[in-house]
Swiss-Prot record:
A Gene Ontology biological process term: dUDP biosynthetic process
EC number(s) on file: 2.7.4.9
Domain of life: Archaea
Organism placement in taxonomy: Archaea, Methanobacteriati, Methanobacteriota, Methanomada group, Methanobacteria
Organism, as annotated: Methanobrevibacter smithii (strain ATCC 35061 / DSM 861 / OCM 144 / PS)
Gene: tmk
Name the UniProt record assigns to this protein: Probable thymidylate kinase
């Protein structure tokens, strides 16, 4: 099972992945987590470029699109391991939301694995910016607003659940468990 967490920066993806992993571990599932960008040399280069002041320019976004596609190919074996539950912090869907043009992004990611379930953690842009520390903030409010709109347009193309990530950590975690439970053979009504 390949479950992807998507959403703008500051939506709480990392926190919720860790909470879901713990819960799935407790329920006897073999769980592995992945993060995009990865810790590979390509991933490190992506992180470095994201720190640049011009990171949201068209030219840099196209460069990042190529680098993300390359970085993704490095983890394909892990994503294709059907013996485990894979929880991913982002996927090619992030590239579709963040970079353009969409047709080109789709083409360079045509070999990317499609998730079994996408959990879109939805949070307003102001909350996102407030949650991000200055050194972690890659995008401005205008750019994040555009990305959020892109996510909401794209999400219907995938098996998905939209989770209100503006509520408290525990409420978001419970909502995620209820969304994931049926895929894992767990009764969603038993989750509190």
């Amino acid at each position: 099972m390949y479950i992807v967490f998507e959403g703008i920066d500051g939506a709480g993806k990392s926190t919720q992945i860790n909470l879901l992993k713990d819960w799935l571990d407790q329920n006897g599932f073999d769980v592995e987590t992945v993060v995009e960008p990865t810790d590979s040399e390509v991933g490190k280069l992506i992180r470095k470029i994201l720190q640049r002041p011009d990171a949201t320019t068209d030219r840099i976004q196209k460069t990042l699109g190529l680098l993300f596609a390359a970085d993704r190919m490095l983890i394909m074996d892990k994503l294709n391991d059907d013996s485990k539950v894979i929880l991913s912090d982002r996927s090619f869907i992030s590239s579709l939301a963040y970079q353009e043009p969409a047709e080109w992004i789709e083409q360079i990611n045509k070999y990317a694995k499609e998730p079994d379930l996408v959990l879109l953690l939805d949070v307003d842009v102001k909350t996102s910016v407030n949650r991000c520390s200055k050194e972690d903030e890659f995008e401005n409010e205008e750019f994040l607003s555009k990305v959020k709109a892109n996510y909401l347009d794209l999400i219907s193309n995938f098996n998905h659940e939209i989770i209100d990530a503006s509520t408290g950590v525990n409420k978001v975690s419970t909502d995620i468990k209820k969304a994931v439970a049926p895929y894992m053979g767990i009764c969603p009504d038993c989750i509190r």
